[in-house]
């Protein structure tokens, strides 16, 4: 399984192609070099992979060489309309400074775990990238977590450090009394809090850490907790390769991101959980992540931002698209830069897709996945669009419809949505959670992972969701 494939070869491919397309006067390749076929991500994986070194730092160098687009790595707009931008070079330096804080001040090292309860903010990304550099496993938690749930996740993950903002600090304090592994609390706030280290003060004086951990591709990178509706949330571990590189599938094949694109994910816009899969996938493509924080979802704010800023790619859930369409002045707005719209988080009605297309001239492409697996199926520009379909499976997954006895069902018959696992190309490259399932499935005599969803596959290989059958994870598009 471990071959000579180098992760940065994909980034280098973009470099050659981007030079040819956007810098015609420079000496460069005579033709656009396309990234390797996505199957190579499964068939040949390098033994070592570290997203911070192999992707972020490389885009930082391309940026220094003038071989990136005009937009930053991260673009933030405050509620007051104030703008801040961070280049890949700045993100690299600030993540290195954050790494010094984690290693030297918090005494964290390779193999330790850090829980982070922050909304999408620059500081949250610096800290997560610092964890990647050091081989520390980060555990994202929602700012909506209660003290009881924080205690549960801390005890389950055995985290040695927790990061939170001013609003969450009192909640955390009430939760950590019986969490024996927790040693350090790190506060991201303009104010200080007794018993907490001040991240903003520390990062002003911290030196950039020049070393990084030579992490293995299958070393743990992050732990996510499933939402769970009938049982306790489950831990799902993602590898360095799985989260750092495997999710580039979504940014490339579903969102069609290029280094000249700007992605705005509305799921992160109003205090939602930290969505690292979308962010890392965007940066893998050398594209820009756009942030505009809203206390609550506000259609008018969204429409104003889309018409004012050069956002090329919009990601939202179906309800958000519906609310935007229902705004009384929707038809008066013009989105000059917008060219790609994607949806996840539930089935989207054909009426919403049709109205959006009629007014904006843009299709909405749907995606389907789970915390345990990441993106499984998607519609995209490369296949015929069938409104309300989940689309077709994405590598490395073989998605099938099976009956209660795990027998393959023909097109048109409703059954369980399942993933057929091939041991010679294990899905554990994306998610080590699948390793234990392989062992369990082998003992049962078949290699199937049941998603807990019901659906149908049509004659053309498109999948259609019809409902839940048990509690595996959030129904559709569980965001990471």
From Swiss-Prot:
Keywords: ATP-binding, Fatty acid metabolism, GTP-binding, Ligase, Lipid metabolism, Magnesium, Metal-binding, Mitochondrion, Nucleotide-binding, Transit peptide. GO terms for cellular component: mitochondrial matrix; mitochondrion. Catalyzes the activation of fatty acids by CoA to produce an acyl-CoA, the first step in fatty acid metabolism. GO terms for molecular function: ATP binding; fatty acid ligase activity; fatty-acyl-CoA synthase activity; GTP binding; medium-chain fatty acid-CoA ligase activity; metal ion binding. Residues 1-21 form a transit peptide. Monomer. The keyword RNA-binding does not apply. One of its GO terms (biological process) is acyl-CoA metabolic process. This is Acyl-coenzyme A synthetase ACSM6, mitochondrial. Belongs to the ATP-dependent AMP-binding enzyme family. It comes from Homo sapiens. Pfam families: AMP-binding (PF00501). The keyword Secreted does not apply. InterPro entries: AMP-dep_synth/lig_dom, ANL_N_sf, Mitochondrial_ACSM. It is an enzyme of class 6 (ligase). It is found in: Mitochondrion. It catalyses: a medium-chain fatty acid + ATP + CoA = a medium-chain fatty acyl-CoA + AMP + diphosphate. Its EC number is 6.2.1.2. ATP binds at residues 226-234, 366-371, 453, 468. Its cofactor is Mg(2+); Mn(2+).
């Amino acid at each position: 399984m471990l071959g000579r494939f180098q992760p940065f070869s994909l980034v280098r491919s973009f470099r050659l192609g981007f030079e040819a397309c956007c810098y015609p006067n420079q000496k460069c390749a005579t033709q656009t070099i396309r990234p390797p076929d996505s199957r190579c991500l499964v068939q040949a994986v390098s033994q070592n992979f570290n997203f911070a070194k192999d992707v972020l730092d490389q885009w930082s160098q391309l940026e220094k060489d003038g071989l990136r687009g005009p937009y930053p790595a991260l673009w933030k707009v405050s509620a007051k309309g104030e703008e801040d931008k961070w280049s890949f070079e700045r993100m690299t330096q600030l993540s290195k400074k954050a790494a010094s804080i984690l290693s030297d001040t918090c005494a964290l090292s390779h193999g330790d775990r850090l829980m982070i309860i922050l909304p999408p903010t620059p500081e949250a990304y610096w800290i997560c990238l610092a964890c990647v550099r050091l081989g520390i496993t980060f555990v994202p938690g929602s700012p909506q977590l209660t003290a009881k749930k924080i205690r549960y996740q801390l005890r389950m993950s055995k985290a040695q450090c927790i990061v939170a903002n001013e609003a969450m600090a009192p909640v955390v304090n009430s939760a950590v009394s019986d969490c024996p592994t927790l040693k350090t609390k790190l506060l991201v706030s303009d104010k200080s809090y007794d018993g907490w280290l001040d991240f903003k003060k520390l990062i002003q004086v911290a030196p950039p850490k020049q070393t990084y951990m030579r992490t293995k591709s299958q070393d743990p990178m992050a732990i996510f907790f499933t939402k769970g509706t009938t049982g306790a949330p489950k831990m799902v571990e993602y590898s360095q390769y799985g989260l750092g590189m495997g999710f580039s599938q979504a940014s490339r094949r579903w969102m069609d991101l290029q280094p000249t694109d700007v992605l705005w994910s509305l799921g992160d816009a109003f205090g939602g959980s930290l969505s690292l899969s979308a962010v890392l996938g965007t940066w893998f493509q050398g594209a820009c992540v756009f942030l505009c924080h809203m206390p609550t979802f506000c259609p008018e704010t969204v429409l104003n931002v889309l018409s004012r800023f050069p956002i090329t790619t919009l990601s939202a859930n179906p309800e958000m698209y519906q609310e935007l369409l229902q705004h009384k002045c929707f038809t008066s707005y013009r989105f000059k830069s917008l060219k790609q719209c994607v949806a996840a988080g539930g089935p989207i009605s054909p009426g919403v897709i049709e109205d959006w297309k009629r007014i904006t001239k843009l299709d909405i492409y749907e995606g389907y996945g789970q915390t345990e697996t990441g993106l499984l199926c998607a519609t995209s520009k490369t296949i015929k669009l069938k409104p309300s379909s989940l689309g077709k499976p994405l590598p490395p997954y073989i998605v099938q419809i099976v009956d209660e006895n795990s027998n393959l069902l023909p097109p048109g018959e409703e059954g369980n949505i399942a993933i057929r696992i091939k041991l010679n190309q294990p899905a554990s490259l994306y998610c080590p959670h699948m390793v234990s399932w392989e062992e369990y499935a082998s003992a049962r005599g078949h290699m199937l992972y049941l998603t807990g969803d019901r659906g149908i596959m049509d004659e053309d290989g498109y999948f259609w969701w019809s409902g839940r059958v048990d509690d595996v994870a959030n129904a559709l598009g569980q965001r990471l």
